[in-house]
Amino acid sequence: MAKREYPLERTRNIGIMAHIDAGKTTTTERILYYTGKIHKIGETHDGASQMDFMEQEKERGITIQSAATTAVWHGFFDQFAKTPYRVNIIDTPGHVDFTIEVERALRVLDGAVAVLDGAAGVEPQTETVWRQATTYDVPRIVFVNKMDKLGADFQMSVDSIHERLQVNAEAIQWPIGAEDDFEAVIDLITQEAYYPEDDLGEKWAPREIPEELKELAEEKRNTLIEAVADVDDDLMEKYLEGEDISIEELKAAIRRATLALQFYPVLAGSAYKDKGVQMMLDAVVDYLPGPLDVKPYIANDPKTDEEIDLIADDSKPFAALAFKIMTDPFVGRLTFMRVYTGTLKSGSYVQNTSSDTRERVGRLLQMHATSRTEIEEVFSGDIAAAIGLKNTTTGDSLTDVSHQLILESMEFPEPVIELAIEPKTKADQDKLSNAIQKLAEEDPSFRATTNQETGQTLIAGMGELQLDIMVDRMRREFNVEATVGAPQVAYREAFTKTVQARGFFKRQSGGKGQYGDVYIEFAPNEEGAGFEFEDAIVGGVVPREYIPSVEAGLKDALNAGPLAGFPLVDLKAKLYDGSYHDVDSSEAAFKIAASLALKEAAKTAGAVILEPIMAVDIVAPEDNLGDVMGHVSARRGMIEGQESRGPVLAVKAKVPLSEMFGYATTLRSATQGRGTFQMVFDHYEAVPKNIQEEIIKTNGQED
């Protein structure tokens, strides 16, 4: 029997999260180098990074899928040489199209490192991932990276955390120098300066703090103590009584406050210049939680419906969450899972309580970004990959066969952008179906539908980049040659009034005829509530056996709305009357009658077309404020606020997605390439009348 190598208190499951280009992947790369996982450092801009292992990631220099890897940390000064820590790291994407990957990673992590660009501070996507981490109660430390970059300003970065994230965060280190002069780091807790002794930053030596920075270091240490004392009673008591606070006491208080989500330690460094990463790893060990420090994970017993606390314990029955599915070119389908409690051996059976199927785990793997080690057994608190699970998808619960539990699943957003994809040959058609199925298993925010009338396949997702990459993967990994249409907005349709309508279908053509007759009341439902069907038939005027056909007929009809053929959403339907014929009535006749009732209702129900509205963050030089305001109003947008961020201005707005296509080019030319923007789906809203008429003209339904 395999033995646990690292006790739970020496295990850390962490995520590295940030805005795109803050240097997340490079930071992870250095972690792997310093923990001995790789022997050569790969740079993202050379396309050689270990964590970016998909072709598209290497070409684009961005991280798309959160690769999981395991590293072992012995301490900056080998202080954990005899008791090393296992650190499981999930590198997450910073691009807004892939926030689903971030959500998915945060769900299974215990702690996170938020990486900031030292010249930009908190950026729009930082705010998004920070909010996501807060939702999942994930303790965080902040690593202000790129301190060697032109414009790097540590104080500005710390201030931006206070202003934009509104949290209690203070520096536990201070950089010596910035930009090209960034040379060392002051540890504010120990009041020592650390200087590198070699080019790769492997050896560092403590020195006295330079004379001109001593006063600043003392002042910043006091600021730190005050911030932690504010949320920690033990420290507050000592502080108020004017007692000396030892290094150990301060570190213990920082840990307590960080775990309680009441304080966020801030560190400085430059991953690219090999400075500060090992100190950040020490902070991961010192301040971020192990599996025993987080609040218990809640599961449900499907038999009794009672809630059960899952506490990391190898002696308890096995329970894990499948948080990612990937297709590996060498070993096939991989299921990444986080083990919450119990242990699991390769070759054993698990119960997938989400799909109510029993599955056999063929092999278990410990993952490094592109390589893997086979292991005999996984323990509570581990993150590992399993081979052989055929019916498991993202968000499924995997538990002991004799102790079945359902773990809280994950919610995935509805796609807002779609494009048509046309296979070039019949052989490509089959390959396309296979590719879509595999890619949708890996990324639940990617969907595909087929238009029943035209036979056209539409793929949908959260943004252009995501769909771009999916099409690229279809070509490279599945050899699908296809023609791709321009991106389109995923419009929806909805009723705005409550109406009653009759659907009557009768056909006599010699022999058995067809007869179905229904009266249905249609009413708008709340946004996002979907379709609700109510059977209010009394006295059997529509026999029981035909009622499911009425519901099925309505559901089919919802796929193509009355105005322009977009899906009809958020609708209540109440079947309250009807009639039937002893001989001629059938399921098919009632199905058709239901769809006729919906068609009839659409004439008076005030049907509208809904469009996705995006929350847009535009960052541009102050001189371009007028341009940006003009861009937003020309695109039917609403400005919601603006703030100054050093030399640039950030404008927040709500803009229809249909108006944002091609905006990157407009903004680039207006700001000479200095403006950037990000957008994320916010809500659906009815389009103005004149635009609705244009959309109907373009996509119009034939009566």
Curated annotation (Swiss-Prot):
One of its GO terms (biological process) is ribosome disassembly. This is Elongation factor G. PROSITE patterns: G_TR_1 (PS00301), G_TR_2 (PS51722). Keywords: Cytoplasm, Elongation factor, GTP-binding, Nucleotide-binding, Protein biosynthesis. HAMAP family: EF_G_EF_2_B. GO terms for cellular component: cytoplasm. Pfam families: EF-G_D2 (PF22042), EFG_C (PF00679), EFG_III (PF14492), EFG_IV (PF03764), GTP_EFTU (PF00009). One of its GO terms (molecular function) is translation elongation factor activity. GTP binds at residues 18-25, 91-95, 145-148. It comes from the Bacteria. The keyword Cytoplasm applies. The gene is fusA. The keyword Cytoplasm applies. Catalyzes the GTP-dependent ribosomal translocation step during translation elongation. During this step, the ribosome changes from the pre-translocational (PRE) to the post-translocational (POST) state as the newly formed A-site-bound peptidyl-tRNA and P-site-bound deacylated tRNA move to the P and E sites, respectively. Catalyzes the coordinated movement of the two tRNA molecules, the mRNA and conformational changes in the ribosome. It comes from Leuconostoc mesenteroides subsp. mesenteroides (strain ATCC 8293 / DSM 20343 / BCRC 11652 / CCM 1803 / JCM 6124 / NCDO 523 / NBRC 100496 / NCIMB 8023 / NCTC 12954 / NRRL B-1118 / 37Y). It is found in: Cytoplasm. Belongs to the TRAFAC class translation factor GTPase superfamily. Classic translation factor GTPase family. EF-G/EF-2 subfamily. Gene3D superfamilies: 3.30.230.10, 3.30.70.240, Elongation Factor G (Translational Gtpase), domain 3, P-loop containing nucleotide triphosphate hydrolases, Translation factors. PANTHER family: RIBOSOME-RELEASING FACTOR 2, MITOCHONDRIAL, TRANSLATION ELONGATION FACTOR G-RELATED. Residues 9-292 form the tr-type G domain. SUPFAM superfamilies: EF-G C-terminal domain-like, P-loop containing nucleoside triphosphate hydrolases, Ribosomal protein S5 domain 2-like, Translation proteins.
